[in-house]
Amino acid sequence: MSFLTEWLTTIVLFILFAIVIDMLLPSSSMQKYAKMVVSLLLIVVMLTPIFKLFKTDPEVIFEYLTKNGQSESADIKNQINSKKIEIQASQRAYILEEMAVQLKKKAEERFSHDEYKVGRIKLTAGEKVDSEEDIKTISVYMAPSSEKTVQTVAPVHIDTDHAYVTKEAAEQKEAKQIQTQLADIWEIGSEKITVHMEGGESVGNE
């Protein structure tokens, strides 16, 4: 770009110089000779880039063109890789979502509990997701089985922590039983399943 700017600047300056010479010379055969010389010089100036091209080492020209081609090729390759990663991520997310839907459907068909039902399921997996065997973790969020099970309880003030500990232990035991039951339904190792109870207790690996 700088070479082109320099070339155009040279042409403009040369034309201005030719105009000044033409104005200074008197109207005579000398002026005609001067115009012819100036015209020839202008042609030489305009053809300067071509002369430089012929003087340039062909390897230098080839290297310049190759670098530009490689740069454009690298940009295109990066764009293709970026799009490929986006598509793979979308496909992976879709597959995990479909697996979660199927697992929830199985649970709804076979899971039985008086107070809870399977609410939301969240899966994690490695880069490769071809089957349920590729699932690393299953987070199961339990919800009340019906509105009747959700009751408002008046606050109770107790001086000891015995009742609180008993309630916590009971919820953990309940979550453990649900974890085992879901593992049997899905035929998946219970160590992959984490059960989150509505009250905040959870059992499993996270």
Curated annotation (Swiss-Prot):
Pfam families: Spore_III_AF. Its main location: membrane. It is a multi-pass membrane protein. InterPro entries: Spore_III_AF. GO terms for cellular component: plasma membrane. One of its GO terms (biological process) is sporulation resulting in formation of a cellular spore. It is found in: Cell membrane. The chain crosses the membrane at residues 1-21, 34-54. Keywords: Cell membrane, Membrane, Sporulation, Transmembrane, Transmembrane helix. This is Stage III sporulation protein AF. The gene is spoIIIAF.
